[in-house]
């Protein structure tokens, strides 16, 4: 009997890690925090890939490249456009709470629907501007039930009060 061929491109996600990822579809925001090289991106991509096999969903993948807020905002606009949501191209980067609130209102209105929508922000630790994490908290508190934010970071970034308010 011939030996089975191994596929070195197979990703193995342990049952324990799979269990840790399952609540993502029930939470407004999930943070995945671990040191570099621990597979944060791989695990989230696996999770999203598995869900995409069984249901129609929208996936918006945003990569953080530096602590420059303008570059991050351009990444956000491009990521939403690639996912078919071009409405953000009109928006300037919000600079205060009022602008952030207006953006949250419009995001919630445009993303609400029947299909699940996952917004995956990778390497968030590179974005050191505290306004970004506060904006994510404001967004998570108002998201429609079909939208889920997943944030991968090397460091904890949520203020303690916001973590409690979000249920973490």
Across the structure, where does each feature detected by a protein language model lie?
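Short regulatory helix/loop adjacent to the ATP-binding pocket of P-loop NTPases
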Residues: 155-168
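Conserved adenine-nucleotide phosphate-binding loops and their immediately adjacent elements
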Residues: 1-22, 90
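Conserved P-loop NTPase "ATPase switch" module shared by AAA+ and STAND
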Residues: 107-132
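Conserved NTP-binding/hydrolysis module of P-loop NTPases
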Residues: 70-90, 104-108
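Substrate-engagement module of ASCE P-loop NTPases
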Residues: 138-147
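Short acidic, S/G/P-rich loop/turn micro-motifs used as interaction or catalytic elements
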Residues: 39, 66-67, 124-128, 157
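P-loop NTPase Walker A phosphate-binding motif
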Residues: 30-61, 78
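Structural recognition of the conserved hydrophobic beta-strand(s) that form the central parallel beta-sheet
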Residues: 118-122, 147-154
